[in-house]
């Protein structure tokens, strides 16, 4: 009887752990769900979730120049982003240009909004995402110069 109770508790705690993982499982679904997971993590400035988003190394292409980063922390500087009046970003449109089991190329239109939900910037970007294991990762982003993210942009 005690053994059955312990097995039951194991299942309860196991499923509770999965439920608490929440959006983490979004990394394992479609490219679109992964991108929403990334935007949610970015908007929340959630370092733990952002750690799960980026491939290592990660590359950015801007104005014909390719820059490699060993961590998203080298790439994203939220103080630079906030100087534009940014409060959050929203996805306006996505188009899957290429999709396979382990790689996708996505064209995305997005907006940066201020605290009153006014658009402070709007841009088109291209992202290459890869799935080296069970989770999608952002491997490369092509982002216009008009969207500051890093120290290099300020």
Language model features by range: what are they?
Residues 1-5:
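Positively charged n-region of N-terminal signal peptides that target proteins for export
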Residues 122-153:
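Short beta-strand edge/turn micro-motifs at domain boundaries
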Residues 43, 112-114, 129-131:
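Beta-strand elements of well-folded, non-transmembrane domains
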Residues 7-17:
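Bacterial N-terminal signal peptides
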Residues 16-48, 52, 56-57:
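Short, low-complexity N-terminal intrinsically disordered segments enriched in polar/charged residues
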């Amino acid at each position: 009887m005690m053994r059955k109770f312990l097995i039951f508790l194991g299942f309860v705690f196991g499923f509770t752990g999965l439920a608490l993982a929440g959006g983490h499982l979004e990394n394992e679904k479609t490219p679109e769900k992964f991108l929403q997971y990334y935007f949610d993590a970015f908007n929340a400035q959630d370092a733990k979730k952002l750690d799960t988003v980026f491939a290592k190394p990660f590359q950015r292409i801007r104005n014909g120049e390719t820059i490699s980063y060993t961590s998203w922390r080298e790439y994203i500087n939220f103080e630079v982003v906030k100087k534009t009046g940014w409060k959050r970003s929203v996805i306006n449109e996505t188009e899957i240009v290429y999709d396979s089991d382990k790689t996708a190329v996505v064209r995305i239109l997005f907006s940066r909004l201020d605290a009153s939900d006014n658009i402070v910037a709007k841009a088109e970007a291209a992202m290459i995402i890869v799935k080296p294991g069970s989770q999608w990762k952002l491997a490369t982003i092509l982002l216009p110069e008009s969207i500051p993210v890093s120290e290099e942009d300020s």
